[in-house]
UniProtKB/Swiss-Prot annotation:
It holds the Pfam family SEA. PANTHER family: ACROSIN-RELATED (PTHR24252), TRANSMEMBRANE SERINE PROTEASE 7 (PTHR24252:SF12). Forms a heterodimer with SERPINA5. Disulfide bonds join 233-259, 285-312, 355-386, 474-486, 481-499, 493-508, 549-561, 556-575, 569-584, 621-637, 720-786, 752-765, 776-806. Residues 233-350, 355-471 form the CUB domain. It comes from Rattus norvegicus. Its EC number is 3.4.21.-. N-glycosylated. GO terms for molecular function: serine-type endopeptidase activity; serine-type peptidase activity. One of its GO terms (cellular component) is plasma membrane. The gene is Tmprss7. It is an enzyme of class 3 (hydrolase). This is Transmembrane protease serine 7. The lineage of its organism: Eukaryota, Metazoa, Chordata, Craniata, Vertebrata. Residues 30-49 are annotated as: Disordered. The record marks 255-256 as: Cleavage.
């Protein structure tokens, strides 16, 4: 309290009426009247002295004022403390990790020792330069510090400096910190000369290679591991012998596991890491994984110069990776080890390889040799390049290339994810798949260049080469598939996908079946398919009689085979061991049969397998329940680093109106098909594991839909339903709050291919050719549900994938064909077997 305001001797001008106190005292008798002064008679009496008023600054008032002062002081102190805590809590730290190459300073061995005078001096110099860059930038008031973590040699000469940058700012302003913005400040500070046509510029006296500058957001845990005093499970290896294998082994049975292995080889050589086995029970591929980096700090795979490969599943298959420089970082993370986690691996120093050759093809109409990606059978590193020249012995012969689990197609405007091929001045993109293809070049002289991806390490490639007759690519009596394979003409239009791309089953003339012929009775595609095609029904007779097993027969658990198609979970026991009806507790019949364009509001409980997937709280995609823990959706919903992280995702089950789900669970794990192609939407399928299994008490509102049997046969014109909360019309700006349903029909595959041209055997079309009913934005990943007539169960025939617009005439929706992925689903969800 201000002392001047409480002092009774303050000036009268400061007094207020409220400062005056009146004391009323009760006394007996009448109040004395005021006496008039008398004139003195004789000697005057002495006048009485007035009573002294009690002073204001007495002991009692002092105690009161002191108590008030203490109270105000306590309130003020508490308020200031709360404001400080609140201000501190509302600020976030942002971590960025990067590196650049200094070209005008030679590497010293002492730089490997972080306690050495040489390292500390160099680190101080670089930190001062980085400090000056950011303290004079637009982010100066948020900049906190920079820390040099490593100074290493590299195959291009000079020093490779790895560093961290830390910013601190209010949480509300965190959105302004984009990777591009922070990196641009550093790059713009490098002064380059127009006359100097190299990538080297000047940064505060340091000669820095512009092309080497890499900077992106990092994790706080990685920062703490890199600069903390307790490095825990971290090791630095320097390898200088070419013939040695340096072991890397780590294991843990409990607790937290966070290990960093920094591998450095002698200048001019590369590192090959070979992983023999890894044991890891991953919650997701972000927090639980083994990751390989082409640097000494964990810089993500999105960086141009760096590669990263993440493993988050147990494996005992040997895998090896090659660096692009003389260094590599291996990290193993698991925040909570339940059983056993660890790796057994080794690394070695290898020389750089040139990938080029000139080959004279001598054989005629056969494959005579092999070429491969660099460092085969290792994953080949980013930015690699190969050149091959082929020459045939005759001008009538061309070059045939047989790719294993790979295909090349003409390059589009979208670019190439897995590098590009230039073949006789024509550009192609490569993509991985689950079958072989043949690519033919009708020229006796062929120049081929493979330019590897600039960002990714890719699976090894093995290509057989040979010659072929340009005028007759396939032998007489054979059909040439779109995949390049040649199959016997007799296998065309037989109902079996012999070409792997269904090209042998397209544009087939539908004729009345010759029911009485022996060929039809034994091998016809309409035999035992569940549809009666012959008037007497003979095509559906004796379908469960035991016959020798082929690729067209159904196989029971005891290896007995028969002709019946779609026998799995059809409600009829066909196998003696009942294996065809095991694990079939899915999809009760919907009681109602009355992103969806042209659809109507469904009724609650109609589609109990429908799921809404929310990303950061907003509806983003659909999915289908296939078990108590697993969902099935589309891979394109999770494309990219941000969307592939399960942390922001939640699954809303048993929901009719958006926001009113009966059960909500975080997503524990996202498994995207390894061959997914974001350019063509091939292999557009993904599995999601829930963190919490939905309870059995909600089975009336949540139920799994049945997975189709392998190679399920469907017929065009069959009625199915597409459901979702997507847009009702293409022009709508947001989705529907109520679950929509629309009846569609399966479209003939030939019509589908004729419409879009890029349809693979892993896709199917459904819709209404008039355009009245279709899926739309927001329905992606949702189910295409078809009801089986034999038992009334619902089958997940398709997954909403892509299409041209929404509900446009003559452009049906394209769906992922689930029956082609049943073995892949069983690999992760064996309980469905």
């Amino acid at each position: 309290m201000d002392k001047e305001k409480s002092d009774p001797s303050c000036k009268s001008s400061d007094l207020k009426i409220s400062n005056i106190s009146i004391q009323v005292v009760s006394v007996p008798g009448k109040l004395p009247g005021r006496r008039l002064p008398r004139k003195p008679i004789g000697k005057a009496r002495p006048r009485k002295q007035p009573k002294k008023r009690a002073p204001f600054w007495n002991v009692q008032n002092k105690i009161i004022l002191f108590t008030v002062f203490l109270f105000i002081l306590a309130v003020t102190a508490w308020t200031l403390l709360w404001l400080y805590i609140s201000k501190t809590d509302s600020k976030d730290a942002f971590y960025f990790v990067g590196m650049f190459r200094i070209t005008n300073i030679e590497f010293l061995p002492e730089y490997r020792q972080k306690e050495s005078r040489e390292f500390l001096s160099m680190a101080k110099t670089v930190q001062q330069v980085v400090n000056l860059v950011y303290t004079t930038s637009a982010f100066s008031k948020f900049y906190k510090q920079s820390v040099v973590a490593d100074v290493s040699s590299n195959n291009k000469g000079g020093l490779l400096v790895h560093f961290w940058i830390v910013f601190v700012m209010p949480h509300a302003k965190g959105h302004i910190f984009c990777e591009e913005c922070v990196a641009a400040i550093l790059k713009d500070s490098i002064q380059t000369s127009i006359t100097n046509r190299t990538s080297v510029g000047t940064l505060q006296g340091l000669a820095v290679d512009m092309d080497s500058v890499v900077l992106n957001a990092g994790l706080r845990s990685d920062y703490s591991s890199a600069v903390g005093s307790d490095n825990g499970c971290s090791q630095y290896f320097y390898a200088d012998h070419l013939t040695l294998r340096y072991p890397l082994e780590i294991s843990a049975t409990s607790g937290q596991l966070m290990c960093h292995f920094k591998l450095v080889a002698i200048v001019g050589y590369l590192i090959r890491l070979s992983i023999e086995s890894i044991q890891l029970e991953a919650d997701n591929c972000i927090t639980d994984s083994l990751t390989v980096y082409d640097s000494l700090l964990p810089i993500r795979i999105t960086c141009v110069l760096l590669s990263g490969y993440r493993i988050c599943e147990p494996t005992r298959t040997l895998m090896s990776f090659v660096s692009t420089n003389n260094l590599m970082l291996v990290t193993l993370k698991s925040p909570y080890v339940r059983r056993l986690a660890g790796i057994r691996a080794y690394f070695e120093v290898i020389p750089e390889q040139k990938c080029e050759n000139t080959i004279l093809v001598k054989e005629i109409n056969s494959f005579e040799g092999k070429i491969s990606s660099p460092y085969y059978p290792s994953y080949y590193p980013p930015k690699c390049k190969c050149n091959w020249t082929f020459q045939t012995s005759l001008s009538t012969l061309g070059i045939a290339l047989k790719f294993h689990n790979y295909s090349i197609t003409k390059k589009s405007m979208k670019g190439c994810e897995h590098g590009w091929w230039e073949i006789n001045e024509h550009m192609y993109c490569g993509s991985y798949m689950d079958h072989e293809t043949i690519f033919r070049v009708p020229s006796p002289l062929v120049h081929i260049q493979l330019q590897c991806s600039s960002r990714l390490s890719d699976k090894p490639l093995l290509v057989e080469y040979g010659s072929y007759n340009i005028s007759q690519p396939c032998p007489a009596g054979s059909f040439r598939c779109s995949s390049g394979l040649c199959v016997p003409q007799a296998q065309r239009c037989d109902g079996v996908n012999d070409c792997f791309d269904e090209s042998d089953e397209l544009f087939c003339v539908t004729a009345k079946p010759a029911c009485n012929t022996s060929i039809f009775r034994q091998h016809g595609p309409l035999v035992c398919d569940g549809f009666q095609d012959c008037e007497d029904g003979q095509d559906e007779q004796n379908c469960t009689r035991s016959i020798p097993c082929t690729n067209r027969t159904f196989k029971c658990g005891n290896d007995i085979c028969f002709r019946k198609q779609n026998a799995q979970c059809d409600g009829i026991v066909d196998c003696p061991d009942r294996s065809d009806e095991e694990g079939c507790g899915c999809s009760r019949s919907s009681p109602f049969l009355h992103r969806v364009v042209g659809g109507s509001d469904s009724q609650e409980g109609t589609w109990p397998w429908q799921v809404s997937l929310h990303f950061v709280g907003s509806a983003h995609c659909g999915a289908s329940v296939i078990s108590r823990e697993w969902l099935l959706s589309a891979a394109h919903c999770f494309h990219g680093n941000r969307l592939s992280d399960p942390t922001p995702w939640t699954a809303h089950l048993g929901m009719y109106v958006q926001g009113n789900a009966k059960f909500v669970s975080p997503v524990r794990r996202i498994v995207v098909h390894e061959y997914y192609n974001s350019q063509t939407f091939d292999y557009d399928i993904a599995l999601l594991q829930l963190s919490i299994a939905w309870p059995e008490t909600l089975r009336q509102l949540i139920q799994p839909i049945c997975i189709p049997p392998v190679g399920q046969r469907v017929r065009s014109g069959e009625k199915c339903w597409v459901t979702g909360w997507g847009r009702r019309h293409e022009a709508d700006s947001k989705g529907s709050p109520i679950l929509q349903q629309a009846e569609v029909e399966l479209i003939d595959q030939t019509v589908c291919v004729s419409t879009y041209g890029i349809i693979t055997s892993r896709m199917l079309c459904a819709g209404v050719m008039s355009g009245k009913s279709d899926a739309c934005k927001g329905d992606s990943g949702g189910p295409l549900s078809c009801r089986r007539k034999s038992d009334g169960k619902w089958i997940l025939t398709g997954i909403v994938s892509w299409g041209y617009g929404c509900g446009r005439p003559n452009f049906p929706g394209v769906y992922t064909r689930v029956s082609n992925f049943v073995p892949w689903i069983h690999k992760y969800v064996p309980s469905l077997l």
